Amino acid sequence: MLKALQALTGPLAACALLSALAAPPAAAREISPQDQVRTMTRGINVLGYDPLWKDPAKARFQMRHFKTIKDGGFNTVRLNLHAFAHMGADNKLDPAWLKTLDQVVEAALAQKLTVILDEHDFNTCGEDPAACRPRLVAFWKQIGEHYKDAPDGVVFELLNEPNKGLTDAVWNAWIAELLPVVRATNPTRNVVVGPAFWNNISHLDQLKLPQGDRHLIATVHYYLPMEFTHQGASWNPATPKTGVTWGTDAERQRMKADFDGVQAWARAQDRPMLLGEFGAYDKGDMASRAAYTAAAAREAEARGWAWAYWQFDSDFIAYDIGKETWVTPIHDALVPK
């Protein structure tokens, strides 16, 4: 084969071509979770509540928006997947849904974005763990097989915000069950895992990750103080009051201390970190929202974490799809000029 190639291309070109042919595909490359986090840097949550999944013709988010995200200074998208609604009685994923997911993943990868596949049926799982468990196992068995040859820019996240019935002990047991399902087809793919109690920092010290699995990225979500970040949110009756501001020295020091606690855990466990969600709801004062968002992003960056803002569209928005423009104060807070 080498002589034939030399005759066509010359000796140096032939050797280069053979080397390229012999190189492992992108999917076979092993990237450490630390290096993965260094490439992820700034991210944003997308597509959790978009009509795309049920009827692509009604989608608000368009594939071109991945270029908007990349051009906007982001390197990662966290896809919020409510997959259970697209499973049959046998827990098989709908082929049409998988086709849509493939299109989304391919469009994001084409923009050189890291893609986190985040299984987002956290409410269902928290309310009824017994019903959730076989679905979640089936989901990761199918997704693991489906994406086993995907580039290393595709990252898995076992479950968003385990809560309620998914106590620390239950969730840790599920982690020990789910990871082997993933590893059967994706032995070195990086997987995001966070603690119970809605990925809250207060439960990070209860998170039990298998010491032998060194392809894990730990995650937490940060919305403290809730009376500020969720003020006026209809789904959270505990925070009905509006007009709450943020930005005092004491509030900033509280955030720093919270992040320092996470960093101490990360160093002790030798795990890289993803701040998988943060932000402040739209009913808050914009100046305070921008200040909070900027502070959280900079604190994460200062500690070498990747982050993903909540979210591109729907609420807490960073981008106005109707006007096809970034919400300037939020975008500037996330990606300073």
Locations of regions flagged by a protein language model:
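Bacterial N-terminal signal peptides that target proteins for export
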Residues: 1-13
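Hydrophobic helical h-region of N-terminal Sec-dependent signal peptides
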Residues: 10-22
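Sec/Tat signal peptide C-region and signal peptidase I cleavage site
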Residues: 23-28
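Active-site mouth of glycoside hydrolases
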Residues: 31-190, 195-205, 215, 316, ...
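Short, hinge-like loop/turn segments at secondary-structure boundaries
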Residues: 96, 133-136, 208-212, 235-237, ...
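Alpha-helical scaffold elements lining the catalytic groove of polysaccharide deacetylases
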Residues: 132, 254-255
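Active-site region of glycoside hydrolase catalytic domains
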Residues: 137-251, 257-280, 302-308
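Aromatic-rich peripheral "rim/lid" segments of glycoside hydrolase catalytic domains that contact
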Residues: 285-337
